[in-house]
Amino acid sequence: MARQTDGPIAPLPSLYPAAAFQQRVLTWFDEHGRKHLPWQQNQTPYRVWVSEIMLQQTQVATVIDYFDRFMARFPTVEALAAAPLDDVLHLWTGLGYYARARNLHKAAIVVVEQYGGRFPTDSVDEMASLPGIGRSTAGAVISLATGQRAPILDGNVKRVLTRLHAVEGWPGRPAVERTLWDIAEHYTPTERAGDYTQVMMDLGATLCTRKAPACLLCPVQDWCEAHRLGRETDFPSSKPKKVAPTRHAHALMLVDPAGRVMLEQRPAEGIWGGLWSFPQCDGAADVKDWCDKWGVGDSIEYWTPFTHIFSHFRLEMTPVLIECPRALPAEAFSRPTCWRSPAALDGIGLAAPVKTLLGRLAAHLDTVG
């Protein structure tokens, strides 16, 4: 088999006149586009940026409440930069992909300290250099908040453009992505740049969906090569699949006589970075060794394992309830710890499966208490 390269896979497809394409999609936007979402009101760079980060990998319906709560707590970039990371992660609990929240906090600090609280919206490159902001997000913030021309290429836009021109290949490949950026550059207007950005995202989110696209309602249906071929759902090509490995861990639910549970803060990098979770051991033998070492093994109860699926692996977690009759020395743990009631968890960031498990633990303690 020939070795796959990242070089050009095909010449740039024949493109439609940009002005005609813009007129079609913007006419559709004027009648059907989304205009009443919370972040579309008072479109400052800060509000648009927060919404764009939240909308990565997350549905609009889910984001609305999170966005409103976030804005109520952090109404300005200065407020976000000044907040403890724990406060940010707490408000992010349930949205997943927690690196987004950590980068949001880092970027806010950079904007305040290096740019005096003003986003560098005059430069896509400068915007894209902020933590967690790539070229497409930078373009979205600039065009939506300021009206300046700045192409975008998020997942929705990739889907629209790959179908429009039947662009073969997974968009994550550099050569395919370069082709799509060239197409995006061609069609992006100078006038009504913000509306154009919004309509391209709207088309992908509401009509040109992954499954069962509503082609009959699409303003460029008669131009769409994938539709002409009857291959709409073949585009964009899927990412080459790898078998996701399974990792195993035991979650130590250490409960003291007052019914409080021990939580440990995870490292800043890696899964659930900066969030609070249970101390973990790899296997049952490690659990026993740890309990024997610290003298807390008199009452151990293994719960039914559950599986949590990450983007690149599966985590099989076995909860272990351990009665902890006395305080443990600091050296028993390698990270910051705290004792909290499982029913009173305000102010700390928790991954969704940990929050669910704490809810189960609270119910269990109520039953046996």
State what each model feature region is.
Residues 1-35, 40-41, 205-369:
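Intrinsically disordered, low-complexity, charged terminal extensions of DNA damage-control enzymes
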Residues 12-17, 24, 28-229, 233, ...:
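Catalytic cores of DNA base-excision repair glycosylases
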